[in-house]
């Protein structure tokens, strides 16, 4: 043990002596191989907790604060995709799908016809189903984009717009007039207000 300690002390002394007597030799260490290892973005399989968003095209990991900040950080610009940025402000797709599904389960397969028009019959199958509608509500920046994504008839789109306008203006009478009961008003209004607040009517 003592011999090992003496050897370590001797090696340290030799290294320090080299620094004193040959300073230029020590300073000649090539640090260029370390350049590039201090990126603000990380590549690889797993992302760090402070850079949890992985770009789908190039496996670059970026901070959540860099999403939708106006400057692309992913090679393909996915972090600035308008659908991604809209979905980030909206209720999660799962929450929207669950809400729509619960309305259908409670009130019948054609209940959402009151909101989305004639194509919303049969548990939204003509529109692609509950998940398709939930995704379109999440990703569509505006009601026009939503109508285009689901190929809504112009009359159905205008009806939906009038429903959203009623919610925005606090006109619960309009919602009652299309058959939404008092017991359902609170939930429907709460859900639609979330979309209105994120620019759905702009």
Swiss-Prot record:
Family annotation (Pfam families): Ldl_recept_a (PF00057)
SUPFAM superfamilies for the chain: LDL receptor-like module (SSF57424)
SMART domains documented for this protein: LDLa
Source organism, top-level taxon: Eukaryota
Every LDL-receptor class A domain range: 46-86
GO CC entries: extracellular region
Protein name, as recorded: Prohormone-4
Species per Swiss-Prot/TrEMBL record: Apis mellifera (Honeybee)
């Amino acid at each position: 043990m003592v011999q090992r300690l003496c050897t370590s002390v001797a090696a340290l002394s030799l290294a320090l002596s080299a620094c004193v007597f040959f300073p230029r030799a020590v300073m000649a260490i090539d640090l260029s191989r370390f350049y590039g290892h201090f990126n603000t973005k990380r590549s690889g399989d797993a992302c760090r907790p402070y850079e949890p968003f992985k770009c789908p095209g190039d496996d670059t990991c970026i901070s959540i604060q860099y999403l939708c900040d106006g400057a692309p950080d992913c090679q393909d610009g996915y972090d600035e995709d308008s659908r991604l940025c809209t979905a980030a402000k909206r209720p999660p797709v799962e929450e929207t799908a669950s809400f729509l599904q619960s309305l259908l389960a409670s009130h019948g397969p054609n209940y959402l016809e009151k909101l989305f028009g004639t194509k919303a019959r049969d548990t939204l199958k003509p529109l692609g189903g509950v998940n398709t509608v939930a995704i379109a509500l999440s990703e569509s920046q505006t009601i026009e984009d939503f109508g285009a994504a689901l190929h809504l008839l112009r009359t159905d789109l205008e009806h939906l717009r009038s429903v959203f306008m009623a919610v925005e203006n606090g006109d619960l009478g309009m919602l009652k007039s299309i058959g939404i009961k008092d017991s359902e008003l609170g939930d429907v209004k709460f859900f639609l207000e979330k979309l209105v607040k994120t620019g759905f009517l702009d």
